[in-house]
Amino acid sequence: MSLNQILSLKKGEGKFLLIAVLFIFSLFASYSLLRPIREALGISGGTGELKWLFLGTFIATIVGSILAMILSGMIKRKLYTDFIYGFFALNLIGFFALLHQISQGSEAYSIVARSFYIWVSVFNIFVISTAWSLLADVFSKERSARLFGIISAGASLGGIFGAFFVSVLSKFIDVPSFIFISIICLGISIVLKNLLIK
């Protein structure tokens, strides 16, 4: 039995599926690299601030969700995804630069750390949800029924990879370096996204 038969692939679908799996893997790897960093930075100013961070995250999530719905209805899908991914990639570069330059323990560092904690939740709303919407658009209903299980496995593996990477290397790599690796993963997913919707 061939691989195409095992995966229920029709002629010409193998390459397209591979791109989709690598796209979602890279994206979830990027996000899962940020989550442990988010938690570490969130408590860097003390656990007493967590309730305010939770409140800020709650408000940012509501505002972000509303904004995402408005923008997705106003902008064409390709332009919307290009804008969202480009915007958040620039955000990550900004956080990387700030956390690399500002001395840890300073008030400025605490402000950036708290902002990053809330920002990661907004990243999840826009970038992750947009990815699934994009895949739903480029895959027909029939293709989705056959192939989304495989793509979902790619997302799970990406999440596991990112979390494992942080757990293994956290003693050797600083926070800005993990953010830089996340930027690379996001950049790879942007390239693959363009291959999906070209």
Specify the residue positions occupied by each region the protein language model found:
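Intracellular juxtamembrane helix-capping segments at the cytosolic ends
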Residues: N124-S140
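Helix-loop boundary and gating motifs at the non-cytosolic
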Residues: S2-A60
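Glycine-rich segments within core transmembrane alpha-helices of 12-TM secondary carriers
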Residues: K51-V63, A145-S167
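Hydrophobic core of transmembrane alpha-helices in multi-pass small-molecule transporters
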Residues: F25, A29, E107-V127
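Symmetry-related core transmembrane helices of the 12-TM Major Facilitator Superfamily/SLC fold
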Residues: G86-L92, P176-L195
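Cytoplasmic membrane-interface "Motif A"-like loop-to-helix N-cap segments
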Residues: G73-A89, F172-S177
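Helix-to-loop junctions at the C-terminal end of transmembrane segments
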Residues: G64-L79, F164-K171
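C-terminal ends and interior cores of transmembrane alpha-helices
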Residues: G86-Y109
